[in-house]
Amino acid sequence: MNFSNSIKYSGLSAFSPNSVYLAIAKTNSLIIYDNEELKVIQKFSFQSPISKFLWSPDSSLVLMAFYKTGICEIRSISNPKWICTINESQSGIINCLWTPDSRKVFLFNDFNVRMSIWSLVDKSTVYINSPKFNNKCILFSENGNFMALAERNNGKDFIGIYFTGDFSLVSHFQVATFDLENLLWTKDSTSLIVIDTPLEVKFLVYTPTGNLIASHEPYLYGLGIEMAKLSNNSHTLSLGFNDGTLRLYNCMSNSFKEIIELNHNINVITNENLVTVFKEEEISHSSGNKKNNFTKYVECSFPYKLNTNNKLKSLQGIGAISIIEWSLDSKFIATKYDALPNNVFIWETSTLKLHTIIVQLNPIKNMKWSPKENILLIVTDNSKLYTFTMDNVYIIELVSDMNNPFSASNLQWASDGKSFIVSDKKQMLIGHPTILEQNLPFNPNEINSEEEEFEQKPPVEPERYYPINNINNINNNNNNDEDE
């Protein structure tokens, strides 16, 4: 693998959906890089720290939210003079989202009183009251024509289906949940999967018109669903429960029939299990010193005993499945079981059996499959990156500033699978699965020198707003000015 040097940032970074650009926030500025050559394309500067930024789905615009001031600003990558500012300082902003057409923006007000939908084309605004959440349970159909929204009224849960053309209400129905926690929409847009609170062991399936298709309650007592994920082919629903099991359900059947329970409460692995176990171990010098921080993987012999977290032993093996990651081809599922927090379980869906266990020295913080091939990246809050392929496992040392040791805790892939970000709270590295000539390491000092070419701009005034369909006109006017 090939890596950049360490880059300091303020905790916010993202590839554009088309993988062409990389945006990195540095407190009061957002810097746009060409993802292939890592050269600065644009730099947007502000007086307030950026709370959140989002790429538009078409990768042409970027939205910045400033929660403290209640202002949202949108900039164009191709035309830096195009600016849209939305001022919600009176009601406040706690989150923001794009619509699939990249021409409307959702803003969520304080206390989830309402959400506002702002059009970048005609400046119109639509308001929807009582969204239950500001950061989840807002879904769009595969074609982007409809939106499903979880709502809460008079202590009861509802789902509203809206047409995204004008956000008119298409259907509205109550769901039989105690406290709706999560919402999934199948890729064929025919089924809405409703997850109840972890205090209940239940999930339900509805049609977008409000008809109940299925209801499942695997057991009666104890905590319920911790994590829910659809497979990439949308054929299988995977639910991580607090009893240490991963349950798979068939989305192709009308009743969402349960396929299997995959139990993580495993004490001993034997030859009969046909499971490969890789364990990370420290490398000792000939003197026996282990303080060099170098580690390696060893393939374990059988029988092999898994060490359960001591704090959870008294709970009789109870623990949540807190991470579920499907491979691109939906042939493998990687999971984390909180009672065995140092272990990665990899399940093979063709056999419905455990394929591999990776035992780390430190608890798993994050893991992500490549969007293009079966490569799994794993981080454990240290200066190493762990990779799993169908053939082997590898440990990669991450080089960083000696004064600021790297503690990798976050992962993010570009959609084309050619690059990824591994980061902690203050610094990040850009990695490439294969070493290509055009993806050579770069020097952050060179980037800083390029940034100085960009003029520091004052905060944007609200009246500097141009509808989306006027971008070309602005470009033409700018060209005319240059000719003069």
Say what each PLM segment does.
Residues 1-484:
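Long, low-complexity intrinsically disordered regions enriched in Ser/Thr/Pro/Gly
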